[in-house]
Amino acid sequence: MHHPPVADDVHTLVVYVLDRSAVLSPPAAWLSAFEQLGVSLGGDQAQVQRFINAWSRLYSATLLLDHLQDGDELGDPWLAAQSEPLQYHFAFSAYALANDELATLTSVLPPARSIRLQRLWSSTVLQLAAGQYRDLTLRASALNATGLEALDRYEELAAQKTGAAFALALGGCAETATDTTALVEAATNAGLIIGMLLQYYDDLLDQSSQEAQPETVTLARAWAASIGIDQAHRLTDIWSILYARYWNALDATLAPLPAPARLAISSLVQGMFGAAPKPITTTI
């Protein structure tokens, strides 16, 4: 079934604009690692690539929505100059394209695998929506909790936003490739860990712009609310602690996967965040 010519023109424009924005499109290195994972699990390369295309459109849609709601740069002068309704429509169009790609893929997968992939996709989209809602409604001034409650709430937010997106990326590639539940679960959980790390990492790098948004819940603010201002570590110390702990969790999570899959994921993580961390020597 072909789209009407006008629809084709609109969709081509959406793809063109989002793909040329380094801010809104996932890096090629990520997509290459996802493909290596799927193929290493026995997936058909063309089918794995189609899932990655669908995920990329979904990821761009969520990034665009997030940047619009936060007033952040869009990475494309033409898109930035458009009216707000049209900018939001680009996010909707990217989401529509993602679902169209997914439908094309699931139509050729084995029926049971197709159903599982669609369930993973839909449950993840619900998580992303919930995470974005919490990001918009949770206020930093409400983090004056006792103990580690503020950090727990921030961790839940990270899991529902970027964590869920990467759980779908890796889990979806695995689901496209194999019917082995243990492999799909390992890939999905690894994606969750990587996505949460990315949320933390970007948050700590984005401190300057966050100063203009005092009510935005950030890792540093959640850390200070839980640990106490006087005891708060420097940002580099916070990252070192988190990276080491999540790396250890990731290493254990990857155990069921074959060596090529483990290598693809560990190389991806080190490309994103730097060399494997040293053992933890700092205590909270």
Model-inferred region functions:
Residues A261-I284:
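Short, amphipathic C-terminal "tail helix"
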Residues H3-Y243, W247, I265-V269, F273:
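Mg2+-dependent prenyl diphosphate-binding active-site environment of isoprenoid biosynthetic enzymes
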